[in-house]
Swiss-Prot record:
Protein name in UniProt: Alpha-defensin 24
Keyword Isomerase applies: no
InterPro entries noted in UniProt: Alpha-defensin, Alpha-defensin_C, Alpha-defensin_N, Beta/alpha-defensin_C
Location in the cell: Secreted
Family designation: Belongs to the alpha-defensin family.
Lineage, top ranks: Eukaryota, Metazoa, Chordata, Craniata, Vertebrata
Record gene name: Defa24
Organism, as annotated: Mus musculus
Length: 93
């Protein structure tokens, strides 16, 4: 009985592993069909409207991009952004 449960769990795990690359391929295809969405500039502001905040000057000039395939060069991932039902990486420098 334990062997049957173990084999069932392994089969389910194998199906899940095979299903994940298919979902990723579908998302990449949708992204490739819409060029120009990968590098969307986003202006990020920290602080209150009066500008009296305790932030560093480097944070005020933060430039971020929504990227589908990962951050480039000096950028680092600071979260996610979405367009429709697709999630992208929020890469800032």
């Amino acid at each position: 009985m334990k062997t049957l449960i173990l084999l069932s769990a392994l089969v389910l795990l194998a199906f899940q592993v095979q299903a994940d690359p298919i979902q990723n391929t579908d998302e990449e295809t949708k992204t490739e069909e819409q060029p120009g969405e990968e590098d969307q500039a986003v202006s990020v502001s920290f602080g209150d409207p009066e500008g009296a905040s305790l932030q560093e000057e480097s944070l005020r000039d933060l430039v971020c991009y929504c990227r589908a395939r990962g951050c480039k060069g000096r950028e680092r991932m600071n979260g996610t952004c979405s367009k429709g039902h697709l999630l992208y990486m929020l890469c800032c420098r």
